Structures are given as structure tokens and as C-alpha cells.
């Protein structure tokens, strides 16, 4: 950690006071969580802060996803808190989700007093052990003197290299202990990105210049390099595909955009990739939902792979040029060496394949249908709106149809695929971006996972609009069972009808059932324009499918569906 910016005024703190002081110094404005006995000293200190606002979630998992919503929209570490035992275990899913999607979080939990660890004390669990596989790094602070370095290191680690969550478990007696510090840690900064060789850049440029059928393949790791990604694509005329996590890096209507690849991607894109002779892979990890059967993915293509995480290079596909580095740093040196080329023949083949394998959007103009609803919602807002989703069919329909045109516009659970992500993430996005509308597309199964966070949205009067596609089923489970399992659909439908309108109203949300409106588009526009949280309800046929679909374990060219 850099030593510049330190002060030498001796100060006296309890552990809890120091934690809050450090968060203030770090520029944290919002913390979300739920208090409990083992973290009450921190909450006592937090109550005295004039700089930090606390958002009381209704479930610790909700707190974790609220923090994710903040971190995903501004790229900076966000903070969530919980007590020991069930508070900590309730956070696990949200933290694991952040790990797989590379989201910088600081998770602070209370723990039983250090002398009682290992005695099965009330609300004691091995938080440190549980969090090892789901965090970028974790700490159990046994002595108050460790706190300054741990807090500083945690923020540095969370945002350096490949971002991720850091978990700090702090026994109650460490929070109440008193110490004096003379030199306070400087504000934690990102560590420098790895250096890379000029030779690797020259090799990559030569491969791009020589390629006849190159494709640019973007993953979530390009999130901080939108301008240079676009510059590279346009200069070299590279058809560009994006993973679920990279949607918006090129505007949907950009002439070079191929849209999403993979299991529910654009049909023509999966075929175009098979024709490629070069893949320029930036910040992507070749996950199975994107590439299908590994050995049949782009069999004739050489690969340039740039990623900040060394572990991703060669993990799934062996690259011909591998560069461990920050994507933006690499592109700054690569773009001047790349030749401007029209690549007319390649673009003609791409256009031919797009005509041969069109991407129809059924019922695109009907706001009471799945795709039509998404289009109708998009027509009500501009590109400043933030879009979150839960996980399921509605997520894939939204990924396919919504006009995502900028980075950090699209928040979705990619790697872990967590139902219940959408609403609390939308709350976090609204907290971090109070001047923007936040739209949460959800399904009835997903919404019920964290429906209690409606109270959080209402209490804080956040401009979050929940667009609920209610098919009274677990849609993707229903789809896979009906397509691929001989016994058909089992345990994937909800036999009892739930009145989501009454539930939302009970939490204090405005409501609108589009199925009961004479002019659904006008009613949709009216409620979206209205400030504050709202639920917009539409019934969807449980037999609707997300197509195309690559069957599990199949190659991307073995898509089924319309």
C-alpha cells in the first residue's frame, strides 16, 4: 500500500469506531445490513456517523445484493454488514454471486468474542472457513491492532486485478477493545495492473491484421474499457459478440454487434463464430453457457486472450497469444498497431448467415406478451435507465430483446444464476443513482425469493419499477423438463394463485396490472413516469419458451427451437 497521504496525529478508537472512521475515510456513503448482537458495537459507532447512511435490509442476502447493485453501477467497493451465525450464513449466496461475477464488495460480520471461538457459543459458526471458497480473500481479526492493515488491504484487494468480495469477520471483543494509532492508513488504492510485453502486443496485432474472419469476443472484464473496445472494433471492422455480462458494451443496434452468443444467444452468431479464423477474447472466461461443448467451439480459430486473471488464461481454451493485463492498458498499445481494414468478404458472409438464421421476436408489439412487454417498457425510458433482472426465462428474454446501449446499464446474476438477485440489486442501483430510473424484470419464482425487500424500496421511496412476468411456474425448469426429460414437468409449477398486487400494495408500492388495463402501453408509461417504487404485473403463458436454446452438453450449433 502506498504510504503517501498518511497523517501522524495520534488518535484513540475502539475497534468499532475505527471501522466506521476508516469507511468514512474511504468515501463510503451507504452501508447496508441487518444488526445483531455480535456486531452491535459497530452499529453503535455507525449511529454517530454524519457521513454514512445505513440502509436496513429485510434479509442479509438482500443486503448483500443491495451492496452488489451499488458496486455494479459505480465500479467501486460497496459494504454490507451482518451479525454472526445466521446473519453471516444468510450472506453467503450474495457473496458467492459477487465472487463469480467479479464484483468488489466488503462484507463485515460480527463474531463471538475471540476467547469463545470454537466453543459452540450462541450464534457461532466458522465464518472464516465458510467464506474461503466464495471470496477473493477473507480475514478473521483476532487482535485490534490488526484492524488498520486488514481494512486497508481489504479495500485494495477487492478492487485490484480481477475484482471480488473480501470478507472481514470481527469478534465482538475486538470491536469493543481500545487502541491508539499514530499513523492512519492512507486511502486504499487499486494495485497496479500486471505489466505485459511489447512482443505479445506485436504478435496480437499481427494476428489481427492477417486474419480474414476475425471476431471480437467480449466478457464482463471489459467493463472499464468501453471507449477503446469500440475503437478497436470499428478500426479493424471486427464483428463483435458479447457474453451475458458484457451486454451494452456495444450498442444493440451497432452495425458490428452480433449480440449475445451461447445457450440462449443469437442463432446466427453461434454459426458465425464457427466460421471465424481468429477470436480476440477480452475479459471473458469461456464459460460453458457461452461456448457450449468446448471442443466444438470455434474449431478453426486461433485465439488471442486478454484477461487480468492469470488463472483464466488457458483454463478452458488454449490461446495462441495470452496476455495477463488490464484490457484498457492492452488496447491502448494494441490499437495503434492494428490496421484499418474493410473486411468486405467477411462482412458479406456475416450478413448472409444473419439472413439465413434470422432472430425473430414473436409478439414484439404486444405489451401483454414476453418480448412485447420488454419492448414496451424500453419505449418508456431512455438509456439512462438501469436494468436489473432476476434469473430465469425473463432474464434471457430481456437479454435478447432489451436495447442495452451502455456499460453498467445491465445488472444480472451471471455466474451463479441467483434467483432473488433482481429486486435488491435494483434497490442498490437506485441508492447509488438516485437520478436514474431502475427497472427490475422478474418472474414470480424469482420475486418470491427476496420479496421482503419491497419494504426496503418503499421505506426509502426509491424509483424502482418491478416488471413481473407471472407464469405461475419456474419457467426455465419447466422448459428444460418439457424439452429434455421423459417424465415431463414436475415440481415446477405453483398450483396456488398468489395476489402479487395485494402483496406489493401491502408493502407500500404502487401497482398496475396490465392485463386489466384498456390501454396497456399508456398505463405502463404512466406508472413508470410516476416517482417511487411500483409493481407492474403481466401474466405470461407457462408454455412460452426461450429460443433458441442449446441443450445442456451440446455444441452451440445444435440449437433447438424456433
Swiss-Prot record:
Which EC class does it fall in?
A: transferase
Q: Which UniProt keywords apply?
A: Amino-acid biosynthesis, Branched-chain amino acid biosynthesis, FAD, Flavoprotein, Magnesium, Metal-binding, Thiamine pyrophosphate, Transferase
User: How does the cofactor bind to this protein, according to its record?
Assistant: Binds 1 Mg(2+) ion per subunit.
Residues that, per the record, bind Mg(2+): 444, 471
Q: Which InterPro entries match?
A: Acetolactate_synth_lsu (IPR012846), AHAS_TPP (IPR039368), DHS-like_NAD/FAD-binding_dom (IPR029035), THDP-binding (IPR029061), Thiamin_PyroP_enz_cen_dom (IPR012000), Thiamin_PyroP_enz_TPP-bd_dom (IPR012001), TPP-bd_CS (IPR000399), TPP_enz (IPR045229)
All disulfide bonds of the chain are none
EC code: 2.2.1.6
Is Cytoplasm one of the keywords?
no
Q: Region labeled Thiamine pyrophosphate binding — which residues? A: 393-473
GO process terms (BP): branched-chain amino acid biosynthetic process; isoleucine biosynthetic process; L-valine biosynthetic process
GO CC field: acetolactate synthase complex
Q: Which residues make up the binding site for FAD? A: 162, 264-285, 307-326
The terms under GO molecular function for this entry are:
acetolactate synthase activity; flavin adenine dinucleotide binding; magnesium ion binding; thiamine pyrophosphate binding
Instruction: Describe, as the record does, how this protein assembles with itself and its partners.
Output: Dimer of large and small chains.
Print the miscellaneous field.
Answer: E.coli contains genes for 3 AHAS isozymes: ilvBN, ilvGM and ilvIH.
Name this polypeptide is given: Acetolactate synthase isozyme 1 large subunit
Q: What is the lineage of its organism?
A: Bacteria, Pseudomonadati, Pseudomonadota, Gammaproteobacteria, Enterobacterales
Name of the gene this protein is made from: ilvB
Amino acid at each position: 500500500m502506498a504510504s503517501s497521504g498518511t497523517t501522524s496525529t495520534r488518535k484513540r478508537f475502539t475497534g468499532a469506531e475505527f471501522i466506521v472512521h476508516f469507511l468514512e475515510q474511504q468515501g463510503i456513503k451507504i452501508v447496508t445490513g441487518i444488526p445483531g448482537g455480535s456486531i452491535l458495537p459497530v452499529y453503535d459507532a455507525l449511529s454517530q456517523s454524519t457521513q454514512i447512511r445505513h440502509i436496513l435490509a429485510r434479509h442479509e442476502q438482500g443486503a448483500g445484493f443491495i451492496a452488489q447493485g451499488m458496486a455494479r453501477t459505480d465500479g467501486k467497493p460497496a459494504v454490507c454488514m451482518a451479525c454472526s451465525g445466521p446473519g453471516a450464513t444468510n450472506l453467503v449466496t450474495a457473496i458467492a454471486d459477487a465472487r463469480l461475477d467479479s464484483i468488489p464488495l466488503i462484507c463485515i460480520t460480527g463474531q463471538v468474542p475471540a476467547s469463545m471461538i470454537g466453543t459452540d457459543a450462541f450464534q457461532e459458526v466458522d465464518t472464516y472457513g465458510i467464506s474461503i471458497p466464495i471470496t477473493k480473500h477473507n480475514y478473521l481479526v483476532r487482535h485490534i491492532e490488526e484492524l488498520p492493515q486488514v481494512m486497508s488491504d481489504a479495500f485494495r484487494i477487492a478492487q485490484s486485478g480481477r475484482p471480488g468480495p473480501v470478507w472481514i469477520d470481527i469478534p465482538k471483543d475486538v470491536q469493543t477493545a481500545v487502541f491508539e494509532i499514530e499513523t492512519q492508513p492512507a486511502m486504499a488504492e487499486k494495485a497496479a495492473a500486471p505489466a505485459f510485453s511489447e512482443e505479445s502486443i506485436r504478435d496480437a496485432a499481427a494476428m489481427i491484421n492477417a486474419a480474414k474472419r476475425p471476431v471480437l469476443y467480449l466478457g464482463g472484464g471489459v467493463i472499464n474499457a468501453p471507449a477503446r473496445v469500440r475503437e478497436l472494433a470499428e478500426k479493424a471492422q471486427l464483428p463483435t459478440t458479447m457474453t451475458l455480462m458484457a451486454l451494452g458494451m456495444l450498442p444493440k443496434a451497432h452495425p458490428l454487434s452480433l449480440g449475445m452468443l451461447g445457450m440462449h444467444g443469437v442463432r446466427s452468431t453461434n454459426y458465425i463464430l464457427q466460421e471465424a479464423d481468429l477470436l480476440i477474447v477480452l475479459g471473458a472466461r469461456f464459460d460453458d453457457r457461452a461456448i457450449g461443448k468446448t471442443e466444438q467451439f470455434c474449431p478453426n480459430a486461433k485465439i488471442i486472450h486478454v484477461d487480468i486473471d492469470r488463472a483464466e488464461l488457458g483454463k478452458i481454451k488454449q490461446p495462441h497469444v495470452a496476455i495477463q493485463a488490464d484490457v484498457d492498458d492492452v488496447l491502448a498499445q494494441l490499437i495503434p498497431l492494428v490496421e484499418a481494414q474493410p473486411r468486405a468478404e467477411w462482412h458479406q458472409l456475416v450478413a448472409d448467415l444473419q439472413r439465413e438464421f434470422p432472430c425473430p421476436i414473436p409478439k414484439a408489439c404486444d405489451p401483454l406478451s414476453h418480448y412485447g412487454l420488454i419492448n414496451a417498457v424500453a419505449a418508456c425510458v431512455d438509456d439512462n435507465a438501469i436494468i436489473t433482472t432476476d434469473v430465469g426465462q425473463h432474464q434471457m428474454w430481456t437479454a435478447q430483446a432489451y436495447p442495452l446501449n451502455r456499460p453498467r446499464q445491465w445488472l444480472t446474476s451471471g455466474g451463479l444464476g441467483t434467483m432473488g438477485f433482481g429486486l435488491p440489486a435494483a434497490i442498490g442501483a437506485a441508492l447509488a443513482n438516485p437520478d436514474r430510473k431502475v427497472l427490475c424484470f422478474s418472474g414470480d419464482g424469482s420475486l418470491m425469493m427476496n420479496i421482503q425487500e419491497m419494504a426496503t424500496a418503499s421505506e426509502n421511496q426509491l424509483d424502482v419499477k418491478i416488471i413481473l412476468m407471472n407464469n405461475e411456474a419456474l419457467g426455465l425448469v419447466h422448459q428444460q423438463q418439457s424439452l429434455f426429460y421423459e417424465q415431463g414437468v414436475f415440481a415446477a409449477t405453483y398450483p396456488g394463485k398468489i395476489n402479487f398486487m395485494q402483496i406489493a400494495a401491502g408493502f407500500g408500492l404502487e401497482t398496475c396490472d396490465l392485463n386489466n388495463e384498456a390501454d396497456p402501453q399508456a398505463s405502463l408509461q404512466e406508472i413508470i413516469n410516476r416517482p417511487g417504487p411500483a409493481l407492474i404485473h403481466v401474466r405470461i403463458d407457462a408454455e412460452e419458451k426461450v429460443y433458441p436454446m442449446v441443450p445442456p452438453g451440446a455444441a452451440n450449433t445444435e440449437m433447438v427451437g424456433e
